[in-house]
Amino acid sequence: MTSSSVLPSTAAQIVQSFLDAFARHDVEAAVAAADPQVTVTVHPLGLHATGPEILKTVLTDLVRAFPDLMISVSRVIATGDVVTALFKAEGTQAASYAGAINQEKHLDIDQAWRFTVSSGLITDVSAYWCQAQLYRRLAVKRYDEIAIA
């Protein structure tokens, strides 16, 4: 290893490298920061599962539905091995997402993701955002008629 190829070592650096990869739409690089037994919880979607394939699906669905997705990180707060990232996700819908059919609406939504890092890998990801706000931004008129995609 050369001095110019420094790997992230602190929990905050590991999470920042995940977020940087996600912002570049490099899902493979983002998922590479996760432990093989990573626990993934996406509270607004009612998702709670284990494994990097789940994380890959969550990220891929976002990038697919919003191909111009921009992730603007406002804060990364580290407390030991737990890191919270606050960011805004922005983009124009180009495919169905979370049951909302594509109406080419612009989405901008604040999110908070909590990560736990152990032995240099992300072992837990919990994502939070206001699902009602997401549906309003995507022009869903009736929540009882969400299309399951």
Language-model region placement:
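C-terminal and inter-domain tail/linker signature
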Residues: M1-A149
